[in-house]
Amino acid sequence: MNERQTGGEGEIVLRKVFEGDLPIFFEQQQDKAANYLAAFIYRDPYDRQAFNNHWHKIFVNPTVVNRTILYNGQVAGYLGKFEIEGQPEITYWLGKNYWGKGIATGALTEFMKELEERPIYARAAKDNFGSIRVLQKCGFQITGYDRGFANARGQEIEEAILQLG
């Protein structure tokens, strides 16, 4: 399960998410600019108990697949596959310090090799050009748009719906 790939000047490794990764994920999700771009975040990203409860539900859900992204041995973020109404969907988060190095693209490329389900979907705020570009580099295509309430922005916004396969 430890998939390896290079990203920029470093090594990308995917591994199982450990409980010890959660404080790093929580810290990464405190960045206001990152939350704005992600848009569809927890109601209160600063509520550690809500964050821990959310991850506990993830850990016990057999349909969820999670991987921690390591970059040069450091926890850079995570990837996940979950289901909404029986449809597989992926999500990912990368700490801001790791943006712009090809890490998200490299990690998602490896993750998609592990997941055999197709079609598989992803969503991103329509103005999150970086995330949409990562998804497109990994073969996802925009199939439409939807609107949803973005907690990070306090309003309804448009989101791109992407599909692979």
Where are these regions (language model features)?
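Conserved GNAT-fold acetyl-CoA-binding loop/helix
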Residues: 33-55
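Juxtamembrane/interface motifs at transmembrane-helix termini
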Residues: 44-47, 56-57, 97-98, 127-128
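Short loop/turn motifs at secondary-structure junctions and domain boundaries
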Residues: 57-63
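Acyl-donor (CoA/ACP) binding surface of acyl/acetyltransferases
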Residues: 1-23, 27-32, 36, 66-165
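Short, P/G- and charge-enriched loop/turn segments at secondary-structure junctions
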Residues: 54-57, 149-150
